[in-house]
């Protein structure tokens, strides 16, 4: 029987459309195991080496791409330190341009925070000794290079930094790294037809890619035992905020935010993850059913075809990670703890109120662009301040060297999963924060606050402040 003209056009059109799909759309169909960054731990005063370098990585099946990374891999190893340690970090810049590094969420003096005051020229080192004096939390280390933070993080200069303490060691939570406790660094990129990342920042706003990567892989899977699985999430994207959920509609249990545990686990069906934000979740895999974490709706066929001809900000595939349970259910399984913190979150009297207006079309804060030689204000160590942050352009906001509680979101009580100590917050209109200043930052080593839309921060949406020590006597 002859093929009708209509069926011929339909068949050839579908074939052409499939062949025209961007490489990332085709590669996403190939299952790949979740890359798990090596674990780098502080032990007995031995230094931890972090080498910033060029390397090759496979972002799309069968295509090796030139990129950056740390210690030989795309992104960096997971650093794990312990409260009470003094950790000697040795950064070595083997790249061909200056780089500055920092650890977001770490409560250390401004002299040790990194950033513009600690630039590393090509071939240079920076080796701070960091006193770890804070409770358990999931921080992250990353490039903090003035005016170049966005491309440097996009290129791969980032990794997780875990702080453990006496409480986290004894809580009945999964804690076997790479077995039932996994780091997930989420990014969006744009890949060309050779699998090479492309970075073309927009004239305004932040960069949005069309390819979702987790630890540098598209739509990865991981095999897990039947029981509770712990995922430490970091949104290392330049500007995209994710709405995460499980493919079968079951609940995730949020146990921690940026700087520590929540008072108790919070079950959620949908979870927001802003740029720079970290969350820890538990997923019950005891039923032995495969489940995927997703980040919204994927692009349709025409969106994919259109993406072949022009840059797209619609994600081709929105699968973050597929969990595949293996083995038999253990005879004894741990129950989810009813409480995570024995004490209520403590806040103090407010010493003053500050207001911040984050720009949109103009990348400024309170009408001013970042100036390395200008400190915008000073605060007092140990004090609490009320910060009210406004914007007409939704974006994340980060503060170095502090911890804060979200008190109000657009006049309302924050969601239960947002009621722990944090350093990064999504701002869509207005948030009210109670900010605590645990460390000192002198004039020449101030802390930064900035838009976590990295392109906007690079253009000037940042400020800096000093923290004076409490007077004695």
Swiss-Prot record:
GO cellular component, one term: cell division site
Signal peptide: 1-27
Location within or outside the cell: Periplasm
Location, primary (coarse class): periplasm
PTM (free text): Predicted to be exported by the Tat system. The position of the signal peptide cleavage has not been experimentally proven.
CDD domains reported for this sequence: CuRO_2_CueO_FtsP (cd13867)
Keyword Signal: yes
UniProt cross-references to InterPro entries, sorted A to Z: Cu-oxidase-like_N (IPR011707), Cu-oxidase_C (IPR011706), Cu-oxidase_fam (IPR045087), Cupredoxin (IPR008972), FtsP (IPR026589), TAT_signal (IPR006311)
Single GO MF descriptor: oxidoreductase activity
Coiled-coil features, chain-numbered ranges: none
Protein's UniProt keywords contain Magnesium: no
Record key words, sorted: Cell cycle, Cell division, Periplasm, Signal
Gene Ontology BP annotations: FtsZ-dependent cytokinesis
PANTHER family per record: BILIRUBIN OXIDASE, CUPREDOXIN SUPERFAMILY PROTEIN
Functional summary from the UniProt entry: Cell division protein that is required for growth during stress conditions. May be involved in protecting or stabilizing the divisomal assembly under conditions of stress.
Family to which this protein belongs: Belongs to the FtsP family.
The protein, known as: Cell division protein FtsP
Source organism (scientific name): Sodalis glossinidius (strain morsitans)
